[in-house]
Structures are given as structure tokens and as C-alpha cells.
Amino acid sequence: FKALSKELLDYLETDDDQTILSTLKEVEKNGLQTTEKLVYSEYNPFTSTGRPSNRFGGMNFAALNKNDGSRKQFISRFDNGWLVEFDYDAYHPRLIGDRLEYDFPKGSVHEHFAQLYGVDYDESKALTFKYMYGTVPPEMRDHPFFGKVHKYVMAMWDKFIRLNSTDFLLSDIYNRKIYRKNLLDMNPNKLFNYMIQLMETESNIEILSELLPKIEKYSSKMILYNYDSFLFDWDAEVDKLDYLKEVKVILERSGKYPTKVKIGRNYHEMEDITEKFV
């Protein structure tokens, strides 16, 4: 990511609300246990999209490969401990739906759209992201969700092109100033993509600022936050299932944002246990 300009840096450093920085620091301080030692991540929220990068000591924690075994080194610090990951289901469509006041039915978002498209789950997922991050085709603009998405994208673009070089857009939750001069080579969908990532980040910070104080009483630690997933080092013997249940309830925000749950002795070999929480 390209760093944002000094204007944004100054704004964040002088603004009374230091929630973003302080929340990320709370995650960083817990560290991640490897087979050799405890290592620490370092978040940088000053990126072109506002979505934090996370690298330290030559390791990119925001892009750990799921397939090459590099995650296997991460284990629990506790005797008989486990790593547990909560991963939001269809997070971006749900965030946009919430922003545009579109209520998804209970269950899978991609199954919901599969019925609309007349295709299977995997193809539905691919089409949804194609429409959201590409262009909503004319034939889909009569659908309540995609019609709202198209209008939202074009309204945002219309506002953006009217800005002069010193003007800015404000983020939805924390009113962060995103200066036009830092958003280069924009088009309507690229701008929308940037703003979705910022919306994701601020929504996560908002929920983490609620979650972290409530789980301080436990031995278990939250050790990594990556976009739509949250990794915890679970002290199973001390905290029992109470810890995981409380985390899940808070993250899901009264069921509005369902999560999938995986567990493993290391971060590479993780088993889906979502159904055990139903």
C-alpha cells in the first residue's frame, strides 16, 4: 500500500479519538507463539485504503500463506492450548447490505444469491464478487441489493469527481479524512473497493474496542487480526468454552455478522467446528 499524506497522519495523531491506534496496540502486545519463540506483529493503519498492513521482522502477518506450511510454526503458548480462528462469512456483502439498509435473510449470503442467479454456491460467490468489485450489469440493477449498490457507487463517484485536490472524503465510522490527491488513477469501482476496505477496517476496530475490554478477565489472548478474521490463543483448561462463546457472540453482533470457527494445535492444520456452536 502507498502511505497516506502528512495531512491524514497529522489528523490521526492530533484527534482526540485514538481508538484505531490503541486497539491495534492491544492486539500487538499479546504476541504470537512460534515453535521457537514469542514474536510480535506491528500494524500500520496509514495506508492508501486505511486497511492496516501488518509486518515485522521480515514477516508479513497480513499475508501468511495458507498452503505452503509457513503457518505451521504458530502454536499456542498454553499447555494443551489451541489456536482458534473466527472468520466472518460473506463480510463485505453484509457490510454493504447494512450500510444500504438491505436485510439479508438468515443463512448463507451466497446461497441467497445462488437462488437469484440460478447457479451453485461456488459460482454464486464468484458472481457476487464480480458484480461488487467490478460493474453491476444492467440486468442486475433491478435487484434490490445490486440496484442499491450501483446507485451508491455512482453517488460516491459523483461526489469524488467534484472534489478539488485539497478536499477529502470522510469515512463512515471514524470520519477519517481520505484526501483526493492520494487516491490516484481512480474509477467508480476502484473507489468503491477502497471505501469497502476502509469500512471493513473501521467496523472491525469498532467491534474490537468492545470485545477486548470484555475478554481481559480471561487467560486466553487475541493474537492476530486480518481483515475479516480474528485469531485467538485459547487456554482451554482455564477458560473452557465460556471464552469462545463470549467471543463469538460479541463478534457476530446479535447474529448480524455470522462467523465460521476453526481450531487447531497450529495455525496450518485447522479444523472447522462452526456447527458445534449451533
Model-derived features: where do they sit?
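Acidic, glycine-rich two-metal-ion catalytic cores of nucleic acid-processing enzymes
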Residues: F1-V119, R176-I215, S220-F230, Y243-I250
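Short beta-strand-to-loop capping motifs
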Residues: L231-A236
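Conserved catalytic core of nucleic-acid polymerases
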Residues: L32, Q115-Y225, E252-V278
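Short, charged/polar, Gly/Pro-enriched secondary-structure boundary elements
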Residues: V238-L241
